[in-house]
Curated annotation (Swiss-Prot):
GO terms for biological process: cell adhesion; cell differentiation; extracellular matrix organization; positive regulation of cell-substrate adhesion. PANTHER family: EPIDERMAL GROWTH FACTOR-LIKE PROTEIN 6 (PTHR24050:SF24), PA14 DOMAIN-CONTAINING PROTEIN (PTHR24050). Residues 331-363 form a coiled coil. It comes from the Eukaryota. May bind integrin alpha-8/beta-1 and play a role in hair follicle morphogenesis. Promotes matrix assembly. GO terms for cellular component: basement membrane; extracellular space; membrane. Glycans are attached at N397. Residues 65-91, 94-133, 137-173, 174-212, 219-259 form the EGF-like domain. Its main location: secreted. The lineage of its organism: Eukaryota, Metazoa, Chordata, Craniata, Vertebrata. Residues 1-21 form the signal peptide. Residues 291-350 are annotated as: Disordered. This is Epidermal growth factor-like protein 6. The keyword DNA-binding does not apply.
Amino acid sequence: MPLPWSLALPLLLSWVAGGFGNAASARHHGLLASARQPGVCHYGTKLACCYGWRRNSKGVCEATCEPGCKFGECVGPNKCRCFPGYTGKTCSQDVNECGMKPRPCQHRCVNTHGSYKCFCLSGHMLMPDATCVNSRTCAMINCQYSCEDTEEGPQCLCPSSGLRLAPNGRDCLDIDECASGKVICPYNRRCVNTFGSYYCKCHIGFELQYISGRYDCIDINECTMDSHTCSHHANCFNTQGSFKCKCKQGYKGNGLRCSAIPENSVKEVLRAPGTIKDRIKKLLAHKNSMKKKAKIKNVTPEPTRTPTPKVNLQPFNYEEIVSRGGNSHGGKKGNEEKMKEGLEDEKREEKALKNDIEERSLRGDVFFPKVNEAGEFGLILVQRKALTSKLEHKDLNISVDCSFNHGICDWKQDREDDFDWNPADRDNAIGFYMAVPALAGHKKDIGRLKLLLPDLQPQSNFCLLFDYRLAGDKVGKLRVFVKNSNNALAWEKTTSEDEKWKTGKIQLYQGTDATKSIIFEAERGKGKTGEIAVDGVLLVSGLCPDSLLSVDD
């Protein structure tokens, strides 16, 4: 049965309302979904892009930036997100990464547009983390010994603390511990430098022995071990670290070579080399020329009395001179050869002496009469036989030869000085003189050589003449002291115009003050070449001449 209209109308209205309600519900649900997207805003019942946003071709709201983001992207209304290396509101400014802290590069940084570049110093290479590592290795620099790779690069090493790196950074140089004074050896030992180290060794003339539970340097007795080089006609005396030689009675020489004094010889003929003989002649000729050029005479005294002889057989007193053997620890064969050679030289010298005496006496050279002719000045000369004589002092020009190798005077080395004077061969290979080499001692060190004149009280004036030489730059000073009650400095020389031998003079005036000795003192300078030398020492009666001729003239 059909429903009545009155009943059907309400049902129709409710159905229509239900249908529209469902559509509105669906439409509301879509708006809510759209409202959750960025840049979507709800305007009443409508959904639209927010301010600063606009719908793109895909129907999605996207932000807008004015005037835009040059090197970046717009992430909000007028809000830019810049790409790395750029900054600013519109991302148009470059970032200087090299000025940032910490610096992005280890060595060198160069800024670029929107980025930067790192560079390494020479000898290094760039790593991915912008650090620099040394590109050189130990195999590339060729060290002398060992090498170590470090952060700064390969480093050459020396195997000992006694070595140091050379300026080239590869080789090792020795450190001289002895010269630097970094080490001090025990008593009686000397420092010997080696490559990379050093050791302490006994001084020459000593040997290492184990005594009383410890090692010590003990003196070698060269005399008992027959390792000395003294002449067969000399006595050997052992000293600490060395030995001394002294000619036996009846012989003369330096102890290493001794020759017999002839029985019939004229007392101590002047045996100086030609330069000294010539100088004596010139000096005497000069003095006699002041006396109306009188001729030089050789006076042969008449025997009248027998004086008490005083024997002084040492032309150079080597009791204070150490004659060091070159091979103190053995080598008898070498020493025997030296002794044999010395003995042959002595025989030849002895024979030459006899012939020379006869020749000189006939030729009229200046010589010493066989008398105690030192009466004028108290000096006793050598006498092997008791002789009688009578002198007329006014007729004598007395000259005493105090040269080192054949003179008649006593010379001694000072024990309290810093170094000894050393014999040095003359240029003509005849005889020797005394010298101080530039390498002897240190700066300001003193070496003294004494000429002994016991009880010299001149009854007339005497002149001391000597040859000297100061060779080398800043080699030192030479002084001469006359030792008496005053010990006065009589002569001094510090420099020389050239390296030639020159002649010095000191006047010994008549008086009551006894002259005990004359001291030649050498003071070392800072020079490393040359020498200080003395030769041809003479005592001549009378006043010193006003002018002297050079030995080299």
